[in-house]
């Protein structure tokens, strides 16, 4: 735990006791502050009370006593409309912050020079965060991993000079962290997302920009217009900007050419790494993630040799292009995290042909219409869930398909068909382009079911990572 000593002897209001809220409350109290916490969910309030946290309805509180108001990132700050607790805080003139801001203030208070790498972007955040953490940890350095990746940031060990922090930040967390000042900040990409919470793409981009604007080194992917504009603006303001690209050959910066990762400066181009044979980092999207990780680790003082070793041993993340098994020449890949067509596109682009594609669930707007360019790579599709009839119409005569209905049936049929393919490496790919809620509690449960079905097939050799 990171006790928030920067708030010692102050009184703090907190709203939001699900997720990271209870951990945040405990860290505030451990630092010597008083707290009054609340939530709209009575069960969450009861859990907090059982954990020894002082609770009270903030609608009845005297807001003049509060030094700050700590808001859970899951609670609306601005859109579609501010939560009632936000209105009360603003009316009382009380500053509104989140758990990442508390970490930043504590770091500034006790160990301002400890390495702090923060990562954001619409897609690829978690993989990049996990990759950086893996590379650093593999060297034997003291590394703490947290934030939006799933570990509440204030449950980590307290800052000290030689302790590295690798923190994934959502737009919600950045919006509540006005002092965010990482030694290296990464902005991977920007596409429309969470606009119901931010009101417009411009607001969403402006929030993401804050993370890199106050960074010692701003590492920015420039393959979309929003990030390109941010990189240009920050460079013009005198901030150290390092550009990365998975699509463009840069005159100055880091870019990918297939599996080769290159650095260009002053008319010279050097190869700094290769992803050839690293299955956990397959595809152009992972080339961008790897470029960001390399630059961040170099800026933190790691050597290229250390970085290369970490890249090669990276196991990947579950449900994100996760290689779960192989039977003969057939590879089985779990990409259950792909809950829309935009997320499925990188998976389909990662394999040139002979894809046995398991797709379906609860369809999103547009279905798989945007994926038609990848249809020639698909040997056959196996349609599951509510989307089956809709996707069958989209595939039409372009791709052979069957309506499998269930994931278990799809795995069995796809494995048999792929095993009869004469290609050197047919791929059975679960990349559903859909939500999971028609048949599974969440994408993790869907991915687990796929993995279990694959590993239950006779003759399958389990895999994990880059082999």
Curated annotation (Swiss-Prot):
Q: Per the UniProt entry, what is one GO biological process?
A: cell division
Organism phylogeny: Bacteria, Pseudomonadati, Pseudomonadota, Alphaproteobacteria, Hyphomicrobiales
Q: Which family does it belong to?
A: Belongs to the MurCDEF family.
- Which cellular component terms (GO) are annotated to the entry? cytoplasm
Which organism is this protein's natural source? Brucella abortus (strain 2308)
Enumerate the HAMAP family for this protein.
MurD (MF_00639)
**Primary place of residence?**
cytoplasm
NCBIfam families, alphabetically? murD
Question: What's in the keyword line of the UniProt record?
Answer: ATP-binding, Cell cycle, Cell division, Cell shape, Cell wall biogenesis/degradation, Cytoplasm, Ligase, Nucleotide-binding, Peptidoglycan synthesis
* Matching Pfam families: Mur_ligase_C (PF02875), Mur_ligase_M (PF08245)
Reaction catalysed by this enzyme? UDP-N-acetyl-alpha-D-muramoyl-L-alanine + D-glutamate + ATP = UDP-N-acetyl-alpha-D-muramoyl-L-alanyl-D-glutamate + ADP + phosphate + H(+)
SUPFAM superfamilies associated with the record = MurD-like peptide ligases, catalytic domain (SSF53623), MurD-like peptide ligases, peptide-binding domain (SSF53244), NAD(P)-binding Rossmann-fold domains (SSF51735)
GO molecular-function terms, A-Z: ATP binding; tetrahydrofolylpolyglutamate synthase activity; UDP-N-acetylmuramoylalanine-D-glutamate ligase activity
Binding positions for ATP?
Answer: 121-127
Signal sequence span is none
Record-linked InterPro entries: Folylpolyglutamate_synth_CS, Mur-like_cat_sf, Mur_ligase_C, Mur_ligase_C_dom_sf, Mur_ligase_cen, MurD, NAD(P)-bd_dom_sf
This one is known as: UDP-N-acetylmuramoylalanine--D-glutamate ligase
Location(s) in or outside the cell:
Cytoplasm
Q: In which pathway does it act?
A: Cell wall biogenesis; peptidoglycan biosynthesis
- Function description: Cell wall formation. Catalyzes the addition of glutamate to the nucleotide precursor UDP-N-acetylmuramoyl-L-alanine (UMA).
Superkingdom of this protein's organism: Bacteria
Gene this protein is translated from? murD
Enzyme Commission (EC) number: 6.3.2.9
């Amino acid at each position: 735990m990171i006790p928030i000593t920067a708030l010692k002897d102050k009184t703090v209001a907190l709203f939001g006791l699900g997720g990271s809220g209870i951990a945040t409350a405990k860290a505030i109290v451990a630092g010597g502050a008083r707290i009054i916490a609340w939530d709209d969910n009575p069960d969450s309030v009861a859990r907090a009370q059982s954990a020894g946290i002082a609770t009270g309805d903030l609608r009845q509180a005297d807001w003049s006593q509060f030094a700050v108001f700590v808001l859970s990132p899951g609670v609306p700050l601005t859109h579609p409309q501010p939560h009632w607790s936000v209105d009360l805080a603003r009316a009382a003139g009380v500053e509104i912050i989140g758990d990442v801001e508390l970490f930043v203030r504590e770091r500034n208070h006790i160990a301002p020079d400890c390495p702090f790498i923060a990562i954001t972007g619409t897609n690829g955040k978690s993989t990049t965060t996990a990759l950086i953490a893996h590379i650093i940890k593999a060297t034997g350095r003291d590394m703490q991993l947290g934030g939006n990746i799933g570990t509440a940031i204030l449950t980590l060990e307290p800052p000290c000079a030689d302790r590295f922090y690798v923190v994934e930040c959502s737009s919600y967390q950045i919006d509540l962290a006005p002092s965010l000042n990482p030694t290296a900040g990464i902005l991977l990409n920007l596409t429309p997302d969470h606009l119901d919470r931010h009101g417009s793409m411009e607001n969403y981009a402006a929030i993401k920009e804050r993370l890199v604007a106050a960074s010692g080194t701003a590492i920015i992917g420039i393959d979309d217009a929003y990030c390109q504009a941010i990189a240009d603006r920050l460079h013009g303001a005198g901030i150290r900007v390092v550009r990365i690209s998975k699509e463009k050959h840069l005159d100055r910066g880091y870019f990918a050419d297939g599996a080769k990762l290159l650095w260009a400066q002053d008319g010279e181009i050097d190869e700094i790494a290769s992803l050839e044979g690293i299955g956990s980092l397959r595809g152009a999207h992972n080339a961008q993630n790897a470029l960001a990780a390399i630059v961040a680790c170099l800026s933190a003082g790691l050597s290229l040799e250390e970085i290369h070793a970490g890249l090669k041993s990276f196991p990947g993340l579950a449900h994100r292009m996760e290689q779960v098994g192989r039977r003969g020449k057939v590879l089985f890949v779990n990409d259950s995290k792909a809950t829309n067509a935009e997320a499925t596109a990188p998976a389909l682009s990662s394999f040139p042909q002979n894809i046995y594609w398991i797709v379906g669930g609860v369809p999103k707007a547009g279905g798989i219409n945007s994926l038609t360019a990848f249809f020639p790579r698909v040997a056959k599709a196996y349609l599951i869930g509510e989307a089956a009839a809709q996707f069958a119409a989209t595939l039409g005569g372009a791709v052979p398909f069957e309506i499998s209905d269930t994931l278990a049936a799809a795995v069995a049929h796809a494995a048999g068909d792929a095993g009869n393919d004469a290609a050197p490496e047919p791929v059975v790919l679960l990349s559903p382009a859909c939500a999971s809620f028609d048949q599974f509690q969440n994408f993790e449960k869907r991915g687990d079911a796929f993995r279990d079905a694959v590993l239950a097939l006779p003759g399958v050799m389990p895999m994990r990572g880059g082999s």
